[in-house]
Amino acid sequence: MSLQPSTRRFYEADSLSTEIYDARSATIIPSTSAAGDVDFYRRLAGQTGDPILEVGCGTGRVAIPLAADGHEVVGVDLSEAMLGLAERSRAALAPDVAARLSFHHADMATLSLGRDFALIIAPSRVFQFLLTTEAQRQGLAALRSHLRPSGLLVLDLFDPLLDRVVPTTDAPVRGGELVHPTTGNVVTWEVTARYPDPARQLVVEDWTTREIGSSGEVLRTDVERLTLRWSLRSEMRLLFELAGLDVVADYGDFAGNPPAYGREQVWVLRADE
């Protein structure tokens, strides 16, 4: 399961997947159990106040609306390519909104910003990029150390569908297409290989993304590997207890519905006293 020379890690560098991230999110998220996530974070921010830390801020999909609402927002991400797009979007904002927003290159597992926050959010399964129990514990400890005594921490994970996290001979079928926001060309993507690793609780997928010209010719092809760790709710509760975090709420989606198999794991947490 080693990376082929032409295979990169997801969001590791400039690629079609980073360029279409916002457009793909706008296409996919509304039809999933993650629908309404931005509004959920906006409501919570109205309750907790500032400052807000977004871990895994990516292109600013969540951070920018929060800043537009008047909040001070700090975004961190490990992907320089995604941060470059976020900074480009920030530069196009009204000066007062841009002044409330900053982006930084940082790893959530070793985060050390020297300040605390009223609200910390880790949207879009960002926590699942921590691939071992040790990394998960380090990440939770780092996040807790940045949390104000009365502050809230929100994590969004997928609740694992067991038929997708075990080895299978079925051919991958997930994919889609959209119009590239800059070039106007059609961009297609599909999961072309899966390497589930249940012993290590990993979902490993190769995603192939292509940009198609007006005559049907393939202009660009990117192959990237997405690796995420899945965890059951019972496992997450134990990790929270070990990290000194109390569960305030546990939802199955961003509408506040109860937990359900195969939906979201939306955790609202507070540092224990």
Say what each PLM segment does.
Residues 137-149:
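A short glycine-rich, Lys/Arg-flanked "PGG" loop and its adjoining helix->strand segment in the class I
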Residues 227-273:
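C-terminal lobe and adjacent flexible extensions of AdoMet/dcAdoMet transferase-like proteins
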Residues 56-58:
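Class I SAM-dependent methyltransferase "Motif I" SAM/SAH-binding loop
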Residues 112-119:
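A short acidic, Gly/Pro-enriched loop at the edge of an enzyme's catalytic core
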Residues 64-110:
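Class I SAM-dependent methyltransferase SAM/SAH-binding core
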Residues 150-157:
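Conserved beta-strand signature within the Rossmann-like core of class I S-adenosyl-L-methionine
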